[in-house]
Each structure stands twice: as structure tokens, then as C-alpha cells.
């Protein structure tokens, strides 16, 4: 049986995708500001979206200058159906267990930025 997910704010797919793009831009701004203030001599990191994935957008954090030589890790996941934001359980999957699995929505008033931290999606709600 396939489960249907609905956005609690009544957003449609096009709006979710647009808000997701804004969310990624906001995360990158937050990370860039952190690196500029705390580590101005280091290569900055940024968050990119993995091109594959039927159910989730995977956000990957990597070095901006040389992504192929630097370390990469999963920043978090966003479900395409409803814009729900999840922390990463592993490289391949989000943490979806329990009532507190969803950390926020990209359609929230904050555009999901309340769930975003410099190093990844907020761990505890």
C-alpha cells in the first residue's frame, strides 16, 4: 500500500519545489556566513542537491573549491511529496522513525530554516 503525504500548509508540487530551492539558497547563505566569520582562511563548504532520488532530495555538503578532493557528507533530506525536512540516518536514507522524524517543512514561515544548522539538519526537536 502506497502512503500519500500531504503538505500541512496546502502547498502544491510546484510551490514545494520553488520553496525547496529557496531553502537550499538559505542553507548555503548560513554556511557561507559561518565560514566567513569563524574560519576565513579555510575553503568554504556549500550544500548541493543530489540529482537522483525518486522520493527525497538529498542535500550533500562539500568543499566549494574542490568537491572531488574534499570530504562530502549528507546534510539532510527533503521529501518531494510534501516538503518535509529530515535529518540523515545514513548516506542513503533519512531518519523517518517515530513522531519527531520530521524537523520542519520547506513551506513553513521560516522556509524550513528553523530546522537548518551550519553542519546539518537539527538533531533533536
Question: Each predicted region: which residue ranges?
Answer:
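Short, non-transmembrane alpha-helical segments in secretory-pathway proteins
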Residues: 5-42
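Accessory DNA-engaging acidic/polar modules
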Residues: 10-11, 37, 44, 58, ...
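Short linear sequence motifs
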Residues: 13-16, 27-28, 32, 49-50, ...
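Exposed beta-strand-loop-beta-strand "reactive/processing" segments of non-cytosolic proteins
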Residues: 43-76
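Short, acidic, Ser/Thr-enriched surface-loop or helix-capping motifs
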Residues: 78-80
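A short, surface-exposed interaction/processing loop segment used at functional sites
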Residues: 82-112
Amino acid at each position: 500500500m502506497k502512503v500519500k503525504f500531504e503538505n500541512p500548509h496546502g502547498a502544491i508540487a510546484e510551490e514545494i519545489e520553488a520553496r525547496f530551492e529557496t531553502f537550499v539558497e538559505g542553507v548555503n547563505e548560513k554556511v557561507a556566513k559561518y565560514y566567513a566569520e569563524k574560519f576565513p582562511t579555510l575553503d568554504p563548504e556549500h550544500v548541493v542537491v543530489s540529482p537522483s532520488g525518486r522520493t527525497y532530495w538529498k542535500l550533500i555538503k562539500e568543499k566549494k573549491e574542490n568537491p572531488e578532493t574534499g570530504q562530502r557528507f549528507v546534510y539532510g533530506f527533503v521529501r518531494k511529496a510534501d516538503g518535509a525536512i529530515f535529518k540523515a540516518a545514513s548516506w542513503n536514507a533519512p531518519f523517518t522513525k517515530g513522531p519527531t522524524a520530521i524537523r520542519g517543512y520547506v513551506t513553513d514561515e521560516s522556509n524550513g530554516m528553523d530546522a537548518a544548522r551550519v553542519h546539518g539538519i537539527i538533531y533533536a526537536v
